Amino acid sequence: MEVAEANSPTEEEEEEEEEEGEEPISEPRPHTRSNPEGAEDRAIGAQANVGSRSEGEGEAATADDGAASVPGAVPKPWQVPAPASEVQIRTPRVNCPEKVIICLDLSEEMSVPKLESFNGSRTNALNVSQKMVEMFVRTKHKIDKSHEFALVVVNDDSAWLSGLTSDPRELCSCLYDLETASCSTFNLEGLFSLIQQKTELPVTENVQTIPPPYVVRTILVYSRPPCQPQFSLTEPMKKMFQCPYFFFDIIYIHSGPEEKEDDMSWKDMFAFMGSLDTKGTSYKYAVALAGPALELHNCVAKLLAHPLQRPCQSHASYSLLEEDEEAGEGEATV
């Protein structure tokens, strides 16, 4: 019978010395509820980025992230955009109630039958906009019945046509009795002043942790030749745009290459409207008036997402497969 020999004292001492010489390797903790995303294992230097937008998360970011850049856009003397904000705010990604103010342009360009409908015939932007607004309101109501909607019509001045209501039928009842008119000016300042009078922005004790009782979102459907807007950025207006619970989405239906080169380009107007969003949280779309109506519907469908839960526009992806990303983005990009 063989008996295993015990390690000699010399061997034990050598093993102890080797163990003491080894540096303990700390393995990162797994991603659990108590340690989401390995938060405790992040480097100290990364803490300086707390509150910054990461990989298109649904938080506020700088204007560079969400601004819809248009090639060839040259600033005009009347364009005085607010400087890009360096303050980055992280808000809770919650589906709180929305107060959606739909601003519909009633300029005569909206009645020109240039959009190509599904059956190949020509229709005007007003008819398509009316249908897509109704679809948007009814779909949002099905998602959350606490959402409220208001309708504002924009001519030379703005008029509050339907007050905030959670009943889609109330808004749709006055949606189709609209007529276009020739508009010489665009009083953008008056539009925002009207919104400020009719709504109140929520305030929370802690923006990063406490969900707001509601958010205010303005959706402007705009279609008219580029013109110098009546606008000056007042202090109350600046506070409204800086509020993390205010969103200004834009759908610009433009005439495209039909415009003369000497005149102000639609790209200038589109870039100016995009510059008003200093937080980078709004969505902006440009659609050609002579294109298919499907593109307009695609843009409105992308606005169904809750502003606090959607990523910044530059990170948004609507394809299921990676190889389809380019084709998917082209559906609503003109």
UniProtKB/Swiss-Prot annotation:
Q: What does this protein do?
A: Component of the BRCA1-A complex, a complex that specifically recognizes 'Lys-63'-linked ubiquitinated histones H2A and H2AX at DNA lesions sites, leading to target the BRCA1-BARD1 heterodimer to sites of DNA damage at double-strand breaks (DSBs). The BRCA1-A complex also possesses deubiquitinase activity that specifically removes 'Lys-63'-linked ubiquitin on histones H2A and H2AX. In the BRCA1-A complex, it is required for the complex integrity and its localization at DSBs.
Q: Where is this region: Disordered?
A: 1-79
Coiled-coil features, chain-numbered ranges: none
Its lineage reads:
Eukaryota, Metazoa, Chordata, Craniata, Vertebrata
> How are the domains described in the entry?
The VWFA-like region is similar to the VWFA domain. Its presence reveals similarities between the structure of the 19S proteasome and the BRCA1-A complexes.
Q: Which GO terms describe its molecular function?
A: identical protein binding
What name has this protein been given in UniProt?
BRISC and BRCA1-A complex member 1
Span of the secretion signal? none
Q: Where is the composition biased (Low complexity)?
A: 59-68
Q: Which residues carry this modification: Phosphoserine?
A: 8, 34, 54
- Report the source organism: Rattus norvegicus (Rat)
Assigned protein family? Belongs to the BABAM1 family.
Look up keyword Nucleus and say if it applies: yes
SUPFAM superfamilies associated with the record: vWA-like
From its record, what is one biological process in GO terms?
Answer: double-strand break repair
Fetch the InterPro entries from UniProt: BABAM1, vWFA_dom_sf
Chief subcellular location: cytoplasm
Looking at the UniProt record for this protein, which Gene Ontology cellular component terms does it annotate, in alphabetical order?
BRCA1-A complex; BRISC complex; cytoplasm; nuclear body; nucleus
Q: Which locations, inside or outside the cell, does it occupy?
A: Cytoplasm; Nucleus
Locate the region VWFA-like. Answer: 100-303
